[in-house]
C-alpha cells in the first residue's frame, strides 16, 4: 500500500483529431457548418480507434489497420511508445453524426483524464462544441459537455488570438483538454525559430515523425 501511495502515477494522455465533410469553403470552427465525419483517438500505447460515418467492409478495415501499423513500424518514436505490444486498431461506424457526437461527449471524454490535440483549441475542440450547439441547441449541448465531466461541471477554455482577441469555449471540468500547439508556442525553445507551426513540420523536426502521405484529393479520401 505504501508503494502505491507514493508512486508517481501520471494521467494517461489521449490525442484526438476530427475530420469534416469536404465543401468549397474551409471549415470555420466558429460557424461549424460542415458535418463532422470522423473522430480519431490514439492512446498512450498507440492504440487507435476511429469513429466515423462511412461504412467500411472487412477488407477496408484491414487495410486501414495495416497502413497504421506499418507507419508505427517505420517510425522509431511511435515504436517506442508502442512498446512490445501490438496496438489495437478499431473502426466504429455510426448511422448519424448526432449519435457519434453524443457518444464522444457523454461516454468517451468522461473516461479520459487528458485529451490533447494539435491546434485543438482553435479548431478541433471549438468545432465540436459549436457543432453540438448547432445540432442540439444550447441547453442540450451544455448538458452534453457536463456529461463529459466526471463531476458534471463545465469550465471555460480560453486563449488569445494574434490580434489580442480573447476567445472562450466551454469544456468539461476534470477532463482536461490541452493544445500541443499552444504549449509549443509558449514553452519550447529548442526548435526555434519555427518555419511553420504545422503538425507535419513540428513533428518531423521534434521526433522525426511525418504524417502519412496521401496523393489523392480529400474528396477521394472520404469516399
Where are these regions (language model features)?
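DnaQ-like (DEDDh/DEDDy) 3′-5′ exonuclease domain used for proofreading
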Residues: 1-111
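Metal-dependent phosphoesterase core characteristic of DEDDh/y 3'-5' exonuclease domains
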Residues: 36-46, 114-223
Amino acid at each position: 500500500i505504501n508503494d502505491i501511495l507514493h508512486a508517481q502515477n501520471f494521467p494517461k494522455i489521449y490525442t484526438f483529431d476530427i475530420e469534416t465533410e469536404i465543401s468549397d469553403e474551409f471549415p470555420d470552427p466558429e460557424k461549424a457548418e460542415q458535418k463532422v465525419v470522423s473522430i480519431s483517438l490514439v492512446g498512450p500505447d498507440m492504440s487507435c480507434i476511429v469513429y466515423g460515418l462511412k461504412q467500411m467492409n472487412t477488407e477496408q478495415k484491414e487495410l486501414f489497420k495495416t497502413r497504421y501499423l506499418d507507419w508505427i513500424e517505420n517510425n522509431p518514436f511511435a515504436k517506442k511508445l508502442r512498446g512490445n505490444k501490438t496496438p489495437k486498431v478499431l473502426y466504429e461506424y455510426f448511422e448519424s453524426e448526432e449519435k457519434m457526437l453524443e457518444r464522444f461527449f457523454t461516454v468517451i471524454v468522461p473516461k479520459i483524464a487528458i485529451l490533447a490535440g494539435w491546434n485543438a483549441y482553435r479548431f478541433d475542440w471549438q468545432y465540436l462544441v459549436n457543432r453540438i450547439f448547432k445540432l442540439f441547441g444550447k441547453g442540450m449541448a451544455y448538458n452534453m459537455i457536463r456529461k463529459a465531466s466526471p463531476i458534471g461541471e463545465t469550465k471555460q477554455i480560453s486563449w488569445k488570438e494574434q490580434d489580442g482577441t480573447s476567445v472562450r469555449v466551454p469544456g468539461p471540468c476534470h477532463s482536461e483538454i490541452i493544445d500541443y500547439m499552444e504549449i509549443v508556442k509558449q514553452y519550447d525553445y529548442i526548435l526555434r525559430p519555427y518555419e511553420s507551426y504545422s503538425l507535419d513540420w513540428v513533428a518531423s523536426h521534434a521526433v522525426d515523425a511525418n504524417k502519412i502521405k496521401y496523393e489523392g484529393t480529400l474528396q477521394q479520401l472520404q469516399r
